[in-house]
């Protein structure tokens, strides 16, 4: 994916970043208007190496079938599914786009990136079980979720997820829900297929080893992108009518260099993820489910524990997590100075406000980074009681940069999810944030 870069022409669109967001936007643009001049730039030596890489995310097709943080319980005891409906519809748009590519024979092996894996929610305790049943009843009335099943029966749970049910007694108060049509998605494999379509069908390859150093207004056209070829050390100034910054955690650092007022006040807080990954194939083959539970009362949504079947590189896998780590880097291949460089005068107050009003998050991160292998195994055993330490190893996942933005009441707040920041005229757009991320790529890129 390294056809020679043509720096002399004026482009209609430059996509910065070689992940699923840039791939989706570039492909939609070329499908709608094949004569558009599109340039894709990636700093690393291949695409889909950061957040889109298979092990760097959970691989869940986020459709709110099992993620309980999308269904808060109100003070009157009712369960709101407004956010769940929104997330589910957004993922359906992504599936429709991928189905279109399959029907047009642009993708010939969808099974290489998407498989059906049932999605479950599972909770312990009377209060949590009552909540899950209330959620089930509301879900059952909505067409997006009407295939949902619910049980408090241990025997039924054994048929759904035998490893979790193993070693438990009928006296334990538990509840679970299930939707069969859940998905497991290898976003790394998908991203590479999208870039392959762009290269083979539209002669629009991703140019790797290209580091974007600045984006400036241009006198002749809207924007000039300054970049460096990391192989030759050559520098280029390339002009484009539109620019999309989809560089994962590094998007914030690039946005801060762009001369638009909409960037003011944004900051970021990096959090790394870690998984426990099973090494025992006999154990792996006993579990065919994605099982999400509830985060602790003071823990952030990103801490929601889950026990998941994955398919990566043609092999079935089993993981548990996430566990949080801390690194000042905004990307796995980033710099230890990323966080420091991101602190500027206009976001100093929001960042301080976000820190001050999120002390429980700081406490949570401190507890997480001091965990050893047995501490993590103890967390796993809350799901899988008979888990043996020697069957599991730690794997470091991707970096996430949570959004910090101005807040009139608190000065600044930490925001989970993704956000699109655009100039008034829409000529430059930047995607910030994390989960549900890749699942909503098509919806988000259509809005861009």
Language-model-derived ranges and their functions:
Residues 82-95, 123-130, 177-197, 207, ...:
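Short beta-strand to alpha-helix junction loop
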Residues 9-11, 231-242:
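Core beta-strand elements of the Rossmann-like FAD/NAD(P) dinucleotide-binding domain
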Residues 245-260:
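Flavin (primarily FAD) binding-site architecture
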Residues 108-117, 121-196, 200-201, 205-207, ...:
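Flavin (FAD/FMN) cofactor-binding and adjacent substrate-gating region
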Residues 59-159, 317, 329, 335-338:
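Dinucleotide-binding Rossmann-like beta1-alpha1 core, especially the glycine-rich loop
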Residues 172-181, 189, 330-448:
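C-terminal catalytic lobe of FAD-dependent flavoproteins
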Residues 30-54:
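Glycine-rich FAD pyrophosphate-binding loop
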Residues 5-21, 39:
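Beta1/beta-strand and adjacent pyrophosphate-binding region of the FAD-binding site
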